[in-house]
Amino acid sequence: MARSLKKGAFADESLLKKVDALNAANDKQVIKTWSRRSTIYPQFVGHTIAVHDGRKHVPVYVTEDMVGHKLGEFVATRTYRGHGKDEKKSR
């Protein structure tokens, strides 16, 4: 079920404060966050945000095309190792 339009998009308050502080200082630092559920706002564009994938922080450079999506969409949490090989085919 989608979020109500009257509520607006969600973004973690601490993440917004960090981005606004970097924008005010005109600084480009990597912002580390665990908030995969945060929506990407237009003021995030041009920043690199390190999003947690469950074991490490993966850097994501935010572009204009990402606005409106969630941070977690751009970092995979599971590694796909492929399906098992058939012993008969390998001989």
Curated annotation (Swiss-Prot):
Swiss-Prot/TrEMBL keywords: Ribonucleoprotein, Ribosomal protein, RNA-binding, rRNA-binding
Disulphide bonds in the chain: none
One Pfam family hit: Ribosomal_S19
Entry GO MF terms: rRNA binding; structural constituent of ribosome
Gene Ontology terms: biological process: ribosomal small subunit assembly; translation
Record-linked InterPro entries: Ribosomal_uS19, Ribosomal_uS19_bac-type, Ribosomal_uS19_CS, Ribosomal_uS19_SF
Entry-linked Gene3D superfamilies: 30s Ribosomal Protein S19, Chain A (3.30.860.10)
GO cellular component assignments: cytoplasm; small ribosomal subunit
Entry similarity comment: Belongs to the universal ribosomal protein uS19 family.
Protein's job: Protein S19 forms a complex with S13 that binds strongly to the 16S ribosomal RNA.
Protein's name according to its UniProt entry: Small ribosomal subunit protein uS19
